[in-house]
Amino acid sequence: MKAGIHPEYKAVSATCSCGNSFEFKSTLDKESIHLDVCDKCHPFYTGKQRIVDTGGRVDRFNKRFGALSSKK
């Protein structure tokens, strides 16, 4: 590998909206990032059903297309 062309590999801190935080190594320019979901609060890993709706997209879809009947 050529010397001096690769980005710096440094520690980055990640904080989830549930309060969980962890550290990992990356080439990101930031020292910390914020996550919406992680393995401690994601429904797949916790086994709890939860709807993650950003901006009311599901409601907007149902409002536009909910009145349509299925084809017979």
Curated annotation (Swiss-Prot):
<feature type="binding site">
    <location>
        <position position="38"/>
    </location>
    <ligand>
        <name>Zn(2+)</name>
    </ligand>
</feature>
<keyword id="KW-0699">rRNA-binding</keyword>
<keyword id="KW-0687">Ribonucleoprotein</keyword>
<comment type="function">
    <text>Binds the 23S rRNA.</text>
</comment>
<feature type="binding site">
    <location>
        <position position="16"/>
    </location>
    <ligand>
        <name>Zn(2+)</name>
    </ligand>
</feature>
<dbReference type="GO" id="GO:0046872">
    <property type="term" value="F:metal ion binding"/>
</dbReference>
<dbReference type="InterPro" id="IPR027491">
    <property type="entry name" value="Ribosomal_bL31_A"/>
</dbReference>
<dbReference type="GO" id="GO:0006412">
    <property type="term" value="P:translation"/>
</dbReference>
<feature type="binding site">
    <location>
        <position position="41"/>
    </location>
    <ligand>
        <name>Zn(2+)</name>
    </ligand>
</feature>
<keyword id="KW-0862">Zinc</keyword>
<comment type="similarity">
    <text>Belongs to the bacterial ribosomal protein bL31 family. Type A subfamily.</text>
</comment>
<comment type="subunit">
    <text>Part of the 50S ribosomal subunit.</text>
</comment>
<dbReference type="GO" id="GO:0005840">
    <property type="term" value="C:ribosome"/>
</dbReference>
<keyword id="KW-0689">Ribosomal protein</keyword>
<dbReference type="GO" id="GO:1990904">
    <property type="term" value="C:ribonucleoprotein complex"/>
</dbReference>
<dbReference type="GO" id="GO:0003735">
    <property type="term" value="F:structural constituent of ribosome"/>
</dbReference>
<keyword id="KW-0479">Metal-binding</keyword>
<dbReference type="GO" id="GO:0019843">
    <property type="term" value="F:rRNA binding"/>
</dbReference>
<dbReference type="InterPro" id="IPR042105">
    <property type="entry name" value="Ribosomal_bL31_sf"/>
</dbReference>
<dbReference type="Pfam" id="PF01197">
    <property type="entry name" value="Ribosomal_L31"/>
</dbReference>
<dbReference type="InterPro" id="IPR034704">
    <property type="entry name" value="Ribosomal_bL28/bL31-like_sf"/>
</dbReference>
<protein>
    <recommendedName>
        <fullName>Large ribosomal subunit protein bL31</fullName>
    </recommendedName>
</protein>
<keyword id="KW-0694">RNA-binding</keyword>
<dbReference type="InterPro" id="IPR002150">
    <property type="entry name" value="Ribosomal_bL31"/>
</dbReference>
<feature type="binding site">
    <location>
        <position position="18"/>
    </location>
    <ligand>
        <name>Zn(2+)</name>
    </ligand>
</feature>
